[in-house]
Amino acid sequence: MHKRNGPQAPPGRGAVTARQLGLLVDFSPDGLMIPEDGINEEELEAEFLALVGGQPQALEKLKGQGPLPMEAIEKMARLCMRDLDEDEEGTDEDDVEADEDLLAELNEVLGEEQKAVEPLMPVAQPKPSGPNPGVEATLQERLTLYQSALESARQAGDSAKMRRYDRGLKTLENLLVSAKKGNIINEADIPPPVASGKGAAAGHSHTQATSQLASVSPPAPESSGTLEAPSTTTPTSAKPQLPPDPCSPLARLQSLQHEYKLAALRAKHQDDTATATRHLRIAKSFDPVLEALSRGELVDLSRLPPPPDQLSPEPPLPAAQPLTSASTLTRPEVPQPPRNLLEALEQRMERYHVAAAQAKAKGDQRKARMHERIVKQYQDAIRAHKAGRAVDVAELPVPPGFPPMQGLESAEPSQQSLVGVLETAMRLANHDEGSDDEEEETPKKQNTPAASTTQLKSSPSKAPPSGPAPAGKAAPKGTSNRAQQQLAFLEGRKKQLLQAALRAKQKNDVEGAKMHLRQAKGLEPMLEASRNGLPVDIAKVPPAPVNKDDFVLVQRPGPGLSQEAVRRYGELTKLLRQQHEMCLNHSTQFTHLGNIAETIKFEKLAEDCKRSMDTLKQAFARSLPTPAARFEQRTFSVIKVFPDLSNSDMLLFIVKGINLPTPTGLSPSDLDAFVRFDFPYPNVEEAQKDKTSVIKNTDSPEFKEQFKLCINRGHRGFRRAIQTKGIKFEVVHKGGLFKTDRVLGTAQLKLGTLETACEVHEILEVLDGRRPTGGRLEVMVRIREPLTAQQLETTTERWLVIDHIPAAMPTVTGPKAKAPLIPASSREAGNRSARPLHSLSVLAFDQERLERKILALRQARRPVPPEVAQQYQDVVQRSQWQRAQLEQGGAALRREYASHLERQLHFYTEAARRLGYDGSREAAKEALYRRNLVESELQRLRR
């Protein structure tokens, strides 16, 4: 240790030195008193007065007094913290806005009136400007200024300025890097210019920076009445900044505002409250314009109020307003209505192409990529449209200012493919059943919030429009349109709710009727929005009401039914009820997901189940044999979920062990095994543990036990546990008397699959350390639903289908199927009404099919069912009778027969489309084959 040479400092001298350096501050009242020994010397006093700009009165008052008042301390602190450069930049008069005494005095005069004062000069909202080429030069200039100022402050030993300049220097460096990358720099984020502390050099640098900033945006002519402030002028802030040019519009406005504030103060001293209020309002109205000038916007100075001494007694004109012509010019114009779908697609693609180019020019790469993806979608849609394929315009984004394209997708003739024929048949089948003649349907108008678009007529002939469509009906009928599916779903749900309200009223359930009626009324805003082409959130639609009596055979069977028939009715009812419940569950799940297509699909299946149940009820009430029923293979896309579990439950199933290892000296038949598990959640110390019961005397025990574990789906620890740890299992041999349990092996179940699946079912290998033992352990884990996404899976079900109408005699539900003109002498005595006409080709097909079925039964030496024999007889009799009638009826009956064939063609077309949509591929193929038979017969008849 080296000894310090020289005299030792007196005790306490270090603390004094620390206080002088500002390291120790004494906030006690004694420490705030000015001591008289050496501190108030004339030299120090003169130096202090020179620093603060000469305030001798305040100091003389403080001499010899006690603790200083807080106002004086704060004022001295402000004076000490100010820079000399700031004193040179501004004057006392320019700080009128910060004069708290003046503002307090004016507020005291005006009272509550100032709260209602609104700016007289409305300013347009600023628009973000693109990247300015002068910003980078400005940042470089400011960077040089801050580096010079930092060096001057370091030489002067001013630590406060050094820290402030260092922060500004780092900010400028970051902004400069961002500007070089092409990003947009907010001018308000640029630190203000500072004086470098080098006299003329600072002034020269400031002048050069100001000229550089002024050259960023070209000034407008003085005669036009519009001036532009420098683009880098920042809003008023507490940081030191350069004063505006005396000839600039900003300085002109600030001077005028200052004059009005002084005039308001003078009027207040003269007790002229009205004039003071008026002048203060005018002064306040300058604030928005000053902000607009600070942001670099164009401002109209032609309507500035005159100086206060020239102000007329009338109310002043509104002050200058920022020009909004630029924003008006850049607003996208509404395009001309397209003539067809191709033109509409090209218009919208061009709009997004322009938007992508603008985003690239502004440096917004994210928005540019988004617009380019939309352009790619439109290009694919245009190629598909030119190739003759259908385009789902509801899936394409619509740019702002463009009306939706609903109604244009079918405005051009396309190839008559099978899909097009089916869709046309669907529209024709939806005609009004009360009209006998084939009237032409007039086009209906679709109301949209932006513009109204036209829609294709349902009839191929062109008829003049008779008027707008009623508000209650939807105009477009495009079956591929998501909006139409949405509208059909909402109308069907409203009808179900109204029917439920009526049933509740009939049962004297007033509260239930009111509830269903309120729910139906609540769907009207959604219906109106859907009719206007707007999307709605179907997840907010109330669920379909369920009537338990729909699937109950309430009538007693007639005397003609046997016990076997009653049992058969009960089985069919149970199957239909299960199918209906499954359809409602899947429909609710897809409704919450917003999948309108799958929701409508299961809604239709549920309606089919109800119609089948109605057929059963009618046959049961009449004591008829059970209707013809069959099972079909239906394939569905369903959401796999375990509704009996809550979100905080996880079920662990330990099913069985397979060839578990046995200890040395024991045979497999002597193994007494059980399994214990360890799930480290919520943490390792509080892990959830349990074990199975002991299964004795086998090496392949079947445990079949389940354990409910508690989880928190959103907890971070749970995600970490399933991703990295899982569940650990130990296969243990139960020890006997004075023998401990022996661990035979371990197994680990990974739970990462639960992210996308709600069930994990695996057969794990039992290991002894890392060595396989040859044993297996079957386990399974279930949660309510996957952690991150819904699990969609395809399932095939045996679907019960009850024939509402025999396949050999399809009743045509068309517009008023008239009875054929049959002479009275040709009618059978027992036939009180004329039989409907059917296609002879279809009857021949049904007869041939029934003959093959009967022949197969006889070859198998099985009895022919009575209903099959009855169907065969009906087909043969109908075919013979209809051929005779067509030969005797003449031209009138042939025309009627042709009309019936057209109706049957439409019926089979719609049936094939509906069955194909529901997933019944075999039934759809049969309906399509019948349709082709009818079409061929109709062509032969017309020739």
Curated annotation (Swiss-Prot):
Subcellular localization: Cytoplasm; Nucleus; Cytoplasm, Cytoskeleton, Microtubule organizing center, Centrosome
Entry coiled-coil feature ranges: 339-385, 477-510
Gene3D superfamilies noted in UniProt: C2 domain (2.60.40.150)
Disruption of the gene: reported phenotype: Knockout mice die soon after birth, apparently because of their inability to breathe.
Biased composition (Pro residues): 304-319
Bias-annotated ranges (Low complexity): 195-206, 229-238, 469-478
GO molecular function, one term: DNA-binding transcription repressor activity, RNA polymerase II-specific
GO CC terms of this entry: ciliary basal body; cytosol; endosome membrane; fibrillar center; glutamatergic synapse; nucleus; plasma membrane; synapse
Keywords for this protein: Coiled coil, Cytoplasm, Cytoskeleton, DNA-binding, Nucleus, Phosphoprotein, Repressor, Transcription, Transcription regulation
Modified residues (Phosphothreonine): T91
Tissue specificity statement from the Swiss-Prot or TrEMBL entry: Highly expressed in brain, expression is enriched in the gray matter and strongest in the olfactory bulb.
SUPFAM superfamilies, per the entry: C2 domain (Calcium/lipid-binding domain, CaLB) (SSF49562)
Biased composition regions of type Polar residues, renumbered to the chain: 445-456
Single biological process term from Gene Ontology: endosome organization
PTM sites of type Phosphoserine: S248, S435
Domain C2: 630-764
Region (Disordered): 186-250, 300-337, 430-483
PROSITE patterns: C2 (PS50004)
Disulfide feature: none
Domain notes: The C2 domain is required for the repression.
Family indicated by similarity: Belongs to the CC2D1 family.
Function, in words: Transcription factor that binds specifically to the DRE (dual repressor element) and represses HTR1A gene transcription in neuronal cells. The combination of calcium and ATP specifically inactivates the binding with FRE. May play a role in the altered regulation of HTR1A associated with anxiety and major depression. Mediates HDAC-independent repression of HTR1A promoter in neuronal cell. Performs essential function in controlling functional maturation of synapses.
Protein name: Coiled-coil and C2 domain-containing protein 1A
Species whose genome carries this gene: Mus musculus (Mouse)
